[in-house]
């Protein structure tokens, strides 16, 4: 049996039974993990951000096992990235020369630009970009650019990175004849922001970065909604191309046992996380199946949300196109204040 390069995504027809509370929904997800996709990445060059641990690491292992010609690990620490590379080689038997490690710190715009420059030095092509790196904070923290840190990492710097990657993704698709993939790891949590949530001046971005109203739980959901507006913006932009060459989609692996909440420290937090993960979390390997699948979906997944092995409906606010377009414009303008080239890229792409 030949192994396909792409898989066809079914429309939503499953997932957790409707009306479940969050604990029961998470428990359902734990007992119904994603299926392992049957797909090949032979001939493809793949980038994974946040690749030295958790979901990103397990996704990189799968790309190596599924035949990707080259895997690029984007990591905050080169030392940890090299350790991850060694483990991938040990687990898959791949040649170490097939894997590159590059530094990327999404807390700083300058690091994003340095990373993209380095990327062009190690590969002339890029077929898959899995933007997995993310941050969850127990306390409010500002980036050097003045934004709440999760907003900076998960949304603004990720938007800059995606914009700078698009030209290479497009040219690679034109050369190979197969569409490239730009996949953002997001979360079902974006659906948990209620329709009547009080937005500051009607702005998701201002609400997400406002220190006076910030709390770890609701702000996580708001940031995921903000990120979904970015995904939809990139999808609209790419759909407007004369020849659409890049499939843009998003994916939720559901709750997985990773170190995303690494800053939640202390004895009580550690014990609580251990129990919580035992009861409700998928393993990182199980979650990575979903990520891999999203980057192998066909054009029907463009602008869509992959979750529980289905094209899942967006949350109510993410279906509000006027709000999503307004938020996308705010994201681009926010990045453009410090990195004006993104405004030019928006005009020329």
From Swiss-Prot:
Q: What induces it?
A: Expressed exclusively during fungal penetration of host leaves, the time point at which plant defense reactions are triggered.
Its Enzyme Commission number(s) read 1.1.1.-
User: What are the record keywords, sorted?
Assistant: NADP, Oxidoreductase
Q: In which pathway does it act?
A: Secondary metabolite biosynthesis
The record's listing under SUPFAM superfamilies reads: NAD(P)-binding Rossmann-fold domains
Q: Name one Pfam family in it.
A: adh_short
Residues reported to bind NADP(+)? 55, 80, 105, 132, 220, 224
Q: Where is the active site?
A: 220, 224
Q: Indicate whether Oxidoreductase appears among the record's keywords.
A: yes
**Record carries keyword NADP:** yes
Tell me one GO molecular function of this protein: oxidoreductase activity
InterPro entries, A to Z: NAD(P)-bd_dom_sf (IPR036291), SDR_fam (IPR002347)
> Which domain of life does the protein's organism represent?
Eukaryota
Q: Which PANTHER family match?
A: PHOSPHATIDYLINOSITOL-GLYCAN BIOSYNTHESIS CLASS F PROTEIN-RELATED, SHORT-CHAIN DEHYDROGENASE_REDUCTASE PHMF
Q: Which family does it belong to?
A: Belongs to the short-chain dehydrogenases/reductases (SDR) family.
What does the UniProt function comment say about this protein? Answer: Short-chain dehydrogenase/reductase; part of the gene cluster that mediates the biosynthesis of a tyrosine-derived cytochalasan acting as a fungal signal recognized by resistant rice plants and leads to avirulence in Pi33 resistant rice cultivars. The first step in the pathway is catalyzed by the hybrid PKS-NRPS ACE1, assisted by the enoyl reductase RAP1, that are responsible for fusion of the tyrosine precursor and the polyketide backbone.
Report the protein name in the record.
Short-chain dehydrogenase/reductase OXR1
Q: What is the source species?
A: Pyricularia oryzae (strain 70-15 / ATCC MYA-4617 / FGSC 8958)
């Amino acid at each position: 049996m030949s192994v396909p390069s792409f898989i066809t995504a079914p429309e939503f027809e499953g997932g957790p039974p409707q009306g479940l509370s969050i604990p029961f929904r998470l428990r359902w997800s734990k007992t119904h993990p994603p299926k392992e996709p049957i797909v090949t990445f032979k001939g493809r060059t793949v980038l994974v951000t946040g690749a030295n641990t958790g979901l990103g690491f397990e996704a990189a292992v799968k790309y190596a096992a599924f035949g990707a010609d080259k895997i690029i690990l984007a990591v905050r620490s080169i030392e940890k990235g090299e350790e991850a590379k060694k483990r991938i080689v040990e687990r898959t038997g791949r040649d170490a020369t097939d894997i590159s490690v590059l530094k990327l710190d999404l807390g700083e715009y300058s690091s994003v630009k340095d990373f993209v420059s380095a990327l062009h030095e190690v590969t002339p092509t890029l077929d898959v970009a899995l933007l997995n790196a993310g941050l969850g904070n127990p306390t409010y923290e500002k980036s050097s650019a003045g934004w709440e840190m999760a907003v900076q990492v998960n949304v603004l710097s990720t938007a800059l990175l995606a914009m700078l990657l698009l030209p290479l993704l497009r040219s690679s698709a034109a050369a190979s004849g197969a569409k490239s993939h730009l996949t953002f790891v997001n979360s079902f949590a974006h659906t948990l922001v209620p329709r009547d949530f009080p937005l500051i001046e009607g702005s998701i971005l201002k609400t997400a970065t406002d220190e006076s109203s910030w709390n770890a739980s609701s702000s996580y959901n708001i940031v995921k909604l903000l990120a979904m507006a970015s995904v939809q913006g990139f999808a609209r932009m790419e759909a407007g191309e004369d020849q659409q060459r890049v499939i843009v989609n998003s994916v939720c692996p559901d709750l997985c046992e990773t170190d995303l909440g690494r800053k939640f420290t202390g004895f009580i937090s550690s014990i609580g996380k251990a129990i919580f993960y035992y009861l409700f979390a998928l393993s990182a390997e199980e979650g990575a199946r979903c990520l891999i699948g999203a980057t192998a979906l066909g054009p029907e997944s463009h602008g869509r949300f992959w979750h529980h092995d289905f094209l899942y409906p967006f949350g109510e606010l993410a279906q509000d196109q006027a709000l999503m377009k307004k938020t996308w414009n705010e994201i681009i303008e926010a990045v453009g204040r410090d990195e004006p080239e993104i405004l030019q890229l928006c005009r020329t792409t």
